[in-house]
Each structure stands twice: as structure tokens, then as C-alpha cells.
Amino acid sequence: MKRFLMTLATALAVILPATPSPAAEHKILMLNYGKDGGMVFEPSYVKAEPGDTITFVPQNSSHYVQSYAVPEGVSPWKSKLDEAFTVTVEKEGVYLYYCPPHLMMAMIGIIQVGKPVNLEAVRQKAEKLRPKLVMKSERLETALGQVTPAQ
């Protein structure tokens, strides 16, 4: 009987699909001042998995979020001023976003979903953004530098 139960358990483990892990929820604060100085997203880098949700939460007035570079096939997104905004990230890749009123102060961030399949395309597009960053322009390279390579 014990052998039968062990065989049955093994067979079920092989046959039945693995239960997918529940999607994670990430919160990104939009701040006038944070640990990295003025006009920041906190955290400025999020590592997520496909299906996770990201909620941007303004903690001060005059902030909103807009995507700048997203994986191929993903629709760009833009929130309303001073309102929380949630996006579900379904495709692997790097998502670069910013706060339009504070772009010149390099209020930018990165979401990495799974493997960074579009990292080179994001880097190329980011170069076009660089001249608009009047202050704290190093934040762009710092954010991109946090992206972990595909494994």
C-alpha cells in the first residue's frame, strides 16, 4: 500500500501542472523628496515578473507617470495628475518611465520584468532622453545599471 501511494503521488506530481505563483503587487511612490534627493520615484528600480501589478502612488502634488520605453507589443501608458495609477506588466523586458513635469530633474525609473529582452533598445531610446535631463542626469545610467542580465 505504501508503495502504491508513493507511485500515485509521484505520478500526480508529474501529470498535474504546477500551480502558478500568485502575482506580486509593487508600490512605487512619487515624491518631492526621497532618499535619492528631490523629485524621485521610490524605489526607482523594481524587479517584477510577468503578471505582477505596479501601483504608482503620488505622495505630493504635481506628479504623474508616463511610460517612455516599453517592450515591443506593449501599449504605452500615462496616468492622470495627482492620481494613483496601476499597470499590470505582462511582457518580459525593461520598462523606462518618467514624471513629465519633473523630467528635467531626472524623475525617472525602471521596471524590469523577467529577462531584459529589450535592454539595448531601451538604452538607445534613453540616449534621446538624456539631453532633457538638466539636473541629476546620472540617475538615468544608475537606473539602467540596476537591470540584471538574462540568465
Predicted feature locations:
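Extracytoplasmic copper-binding redox domains, predominantly the cupredoxin/blue-copper superfamily
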Residues: S21-Q151
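Positively charged n-region of N-terminal signal peptides that target proteins for export
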Residues: M1-F4
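Bacterial N-terminal signal peptides
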Residues: T7-P17
